[in-house]
Amino acid sequence: ETETADLNLDAARITLNKRYNLNLTNEQIIIMASIIEREALTDDDRPKVASVFYNRLYDDMYLQSDATLAYSLGREATAEDLSSMTSDPYNTYAFKGLTPTPICSPGYASIKAAMDPAATNYYYFWITSDEHVFSETYEEHQQAIENARERESASKQ
């Protein structure tokens, strides 16, 4: 039996579309999996990263994925790139919804996470050097960033 035996996209799509009031196609689930693949540090974090992006889609927010920008640019994005890439459909800071195509070939764990995200109220995450910090509100997110930067700064002294 292969790992893919339990990857029933059709069943997952029906569940996701009900849970998040979306009208996703199987291809869009794979697009989501590709974004998760590039954003998550560990397999354990993938369902939580998925929940962030699905929660944002549900609430008609921008995905704001750095990974989609990096895919389009072929390198890490800068703040300047954000303002100059306003017509790029891979700029999920400027375009709502998913990218037109996958941004990589997602692995099994990312596909599973895209099919069955964690049930959270997370809308934000920050990646430190070794972990994700998830937040429910923008204020919590800003505090998490500040805390992470303070820890990194203290560890360099």
Predicted regions and their residues:
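Bacterial extracytoplasmic/cell-wall-associated proteins, especially those involved in peptidoglycan
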Residues: 1-157
